[in-house]
Amino acid sequence: MESFKDEACAACEDVRWVPAWGKDRMRSMILERTDWCISRQRRWGLPIPVFYCKDCGKPICTPETIDAVSRLFEEKGSNAWFEMTAEEILPEGFTCPHCGKSAGFEQESDTLDGWFDSGSTHFASMERTQGFWPATMYLEGLDQYRGWFQSSLLTAVGALGRGAPFKECVTHGWTVDGQGRAMHKSLGNGVDPAEVFNKYGADLLRLWAGSSDYHVDVRCSDEIFKQLSQNYLKFRNTAKFCLDNLTDFDPNTLVAPADMLALDKWALTCLNALIVKVFTAYDNYEFHVVSHAVNDFCVVELSSFYFDIIKDRLYCDGAESLSRRSAQTALYLILDAMTRMFAPILAFTCDEIWLAMPHRTGDDERNVLLNEMVQPYTQYALSPEEMARWDRIAAVRTAVNGALEQARADKTIGKSLEAEVDLTVPAEDAFLSQMEEGALADLLIVSQVRVETGDSLSVTVRPAAGTKCQRCWKMLTSVGTVAGHEDLCPRCAAVVKSLPVVE
């Protein structure tokens, strides 16, 4: 080992270790190692191809003997070493290179260490195939720093005079039960994957693997699967909402960036950030970051904010109106991106979504994984200054939601659309008063809003004036002003008038 320790340690520098502390762990093991015992005393395994001269007692391992053993193994397999005599294996007329004797040889009875076998696979599987050496990545458990990882590195450096046979080395912990105990038959705490498939579906097991930080020991139990099933349903319901609202949408006619509404651009800017985060995580083999980021996006940005706000546009605006098609464009791009991004983890669910959703010309509709990965939609992105304003809108909305909850508890209102809100905002939020009439009310999901500037944010909730529109449920003083549609607001009356008459 002393003859190539420095080279082996230097080879560690050219490898990307995941986690990063793997490099120091490997280097320290190599530096502490003085010898490498590659022989084992057993009657099975790969023989050590060395002969001994009975006369002089010296070992014999020459190109000639190696060729003879190689031909033998190719013809009869390695067991022939134990079934034949040395004279039967060696070439006819062979003589000892040390003493010149032509008879009296015996073969080594020890076998090679199994780690030497596995550590040589890079030569057998990659060296002989053009362009495949070194491997992109080696993946194994934490114990393999002393096993396969190290033996592969040492054989490559010591025998071939090269660097490590892998560009990246990724390690994982062990699967343990919900209490952190090792799984044993005696404890009865093992988890059968087939039972998980039957109870929850294969994708939930994939989601468990993709949600776990595998660099440490990973817990596995039915309770964990139950909790994860909620995350799975959230993703599935998010996709269902998008699909339900895209049945009449042609993705080949996306709304142009210049025409898209600001809220929809906000959603796509959030999506862009998700795309960057997801692919950075994939590049770093941090699959749990992918799963948690997608779940947070579905819960925080979409379900709790964006989806609630756009429902009125999707359900009540004209089918071909810019406002509705703008929302549909954003929904389509969100669904398309999430399906492509999450397919490596939720392979079956994403394929199911892919088969159900509309597609642009050029997409391979057979399977999502046959398509290119998504890139950020920079053409729809808002500027950092614009996103900062949306952060303020979200903060105001949180305050308004709190006031609405209190008003509901006080029986002042029932649904939020029964409310009129008076907002006092600080100077930094004065832009809210400049928003298009009705736009802020839509963002807050109330019927009417009044805004004035003051020293700090305050919210007052009262019952909205006017009559309830029977189509959009908003309380407006304009309801009934359109002849023939006395129970509708002007917006809804115009949409209803435009609908085809069914005879």
What are the residue ranges of the model-derived segments?
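Residue patterns forming the tRNA-binding/recognition surfaces of aminoacyl-tRNA synthetases
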Residues: M1-I66, M84-A86, W148, R181, ...
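Cys/His-rich finger/ribbon microdomains and the adjacent scaffold used
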Residues: M1-W133, E140, P257-L274, A356, ...
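Beta-sheet entry/capping signal
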Residues: W36, I48-V50, G57-P59, G104, ...
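Acidic, turn-prone loop/beta-hairpin segments
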Residues: F105, F249-F279, F307-A403, A407-A427, ...
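Glycine-rich, acidic and aromatic/proline-enriched surface loops and short helix-turn segments
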Residues: S118-T121, A202, F241, V300-D308
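Alpha-helical support elements that line or immediately flank enzyme active sites
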Residues: S151-L160, V294, M341
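Residue-level signal for inorganic ion chemistry
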Residues: H172-G173, F235, L302, A347, ...
